[in-house]
């Protein structure tokens, strides 16, 4: 099956609340490979690769806020964006 890609930019109260750590666990649940990293503007960027159904479930979970301490304002989604192929999902520092 073909794997789809997406870049997500998540804004709100998403840094310093375990957002990247819990995003990594959600990624494992849905067999997502890619990365998650904090950006200097206070947002978080996620690069994700997975089969379409799993990618959509992952995006829905991110929209709900994977971390209990986070507050999502908006999730910008760029489906089909070029993403580096990876075998794992990693937190980038």
From Swiss-Prot:
Disulphide connectivity of cysteines: none
Q: What is this protein called?
A: Acylphosphatase
Q: Which InterPro entries match?
A: Acylphosphatase, Acylphosphatase-like_dom, Acylphosphatase-like_dom_sf, Acylphosphatase_CS
- The entry's active site is 20, 38
The answer, when asked if Hydrolase is one of the entry's keywords, is yes
Similarity remark: Belongs to the acylphosphatase family.
Query: E.C. number, please?
Result: 3.6.1.7
What enzyme category does the UniProt record give?
Answer: hydrolase
Q: Which reaction equations make up its catalytic activity? A: an acyl phosphate + H2O = a carboxylate + phosphate + H(+)
**Gene3D superfamilies, per database record:** 3.30.70.100
Residue ranges of the Acylphosphatase-like domain?
5-93
- Swiss-Prot/TrEMBL keywords: Hydrolase
Which NCBIfam families is this protein grouped with?
PRK14443.1
Q: Which species does the entry assign this protein to?
A: Listeria monocytogenes serovar 1/2a (strain ATCC BAA-679 / EGD-e)
Q: Which GO terms describe its molecular function?
A: acylphosphatase activity
